[in-house]
Each structure stands twice: as C-alpha cells, then as structure tokens.
C-alpha cells in the first residue's frame, strides 16, 4: 500500500481481494486432504478495531485513485465484509450490489457443526453518490440467456487447471473476475488491484482487452504475475484460456466473450 500514493493515475475500476482475517489455526478439506486454513501472517485476526483501521486506510487510499465515475468490487466473507460495508458508507461510496458468489464445488464441512460455507460476497460500489457509473446491462443479459442477471452467481471455485498456474492461497477463478470486469468496464479501461497476489485480475483484464496495474507486497507473486502475463501474450494460449472459462450457458454466449475487441497498448513500466 505504500506504493499507491506514488501512482499518478486514475482508474476506471478497482478489484480488491483484501485479507479476510480468517487464519485462526483451523482446519479444512482440500482435494480430499486435511489442510490448515492459515494463509499467512497478513491474514491473522487481531481485533475488530484493527480490522476496521486496516480497511479504512486502504479504502481511503484507493478512493483517491478512482475516476469520478469509477466503481470498486471488493470480495469477502462474514469475517470482513461487514467492516468493509460500514466503511464504504462512511467514506461516501454508493453501494450498488452485494453479489453472492455461490460456489458449485465448495470444500466439505470438516467440523459438521454448522452449514457448509459455499459462498463469498462481492460488494460493488461506485465512488460518488450522484455520479453515474457504467454498467453493461445488455451484455450481462446476453451472457445469462437473454434474462436479467441476478445478484447470485453460481460459478465454480478455482479449477485445477487454474491452480496449476500459481500457488497463491487465495487465488480467485477467472470466470468470476471476467464477469465483473465485463460488467463494469469498456475495452481499454484501466483496472487496479491493490492486493494483486498472482494477478488473476490482470489475466482476466488482458483477456478482455483491458489494461491493468497490480500491487502486491510479495516479490514471489509479482514474479509469478509477470510470467503469467508473458504466457498469455501467445495468442494460442490466450484463446485456450478463454475456452476453458466456465459460467457461460452455451457456445453462443461464450462467443460473445471471445469476440475480438481493439487491442490496448500497455506501458512498459506496468506489470500488465
């Protein structure tokens, strides 16, 4: 986050996957194996005031880098989403939707003491209360079988072929990121991810002909990001990625996404 104030640029859209603060030494099941839920020191819960202070700080900094008509998407769970919603309102954002991402393949409930966690929430908000935002309503309708797209998205969690691209513990699926990028931006738009990780947001942005800047504190993940970008510069691999995306009802709808749009030019100083 120390880098963000130094960036002299305004963005059309932000996607943020901040710490959920759920690393509590618990256990889960992944690919049939018992695994720790701990993601790293950055995800450790301290106390409610710490979570609020953290979210307030990064949201203030990100807001300064948004165009007046820009929107922001923020993913979370019950561990952090209430704090984020409260602070968005406090900072005069306008909350537009709370998307419920219902995973079609969630991990099973290990403890059997409560309902299986199968959803994440994604808040969509615009920077200003009264400044209109962009929403590609017609495309979302087309991608949903010519029906209005609702705020519950049934999409799979990360697929094995995507997980092989990176070992980041909180990687998001391309299908989710592609949908929200197409919904809220036009081709050539600038997208920022302040918690980029291995830059799946950047991959989705570039596949959809948008421009991207990612920030992360881990050099290892920045190197992975650069390698992933180099990989999709091969048109054959980029097309392969697009065809593997899930969440389209039929081939006609997939073709809408595969339609060639104008290629943007990327600055050499940027990750994407």
Kindly label every feature range from the protein language model.
Residues 1-5, 226-268:
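S-adenosyl-L-methionine
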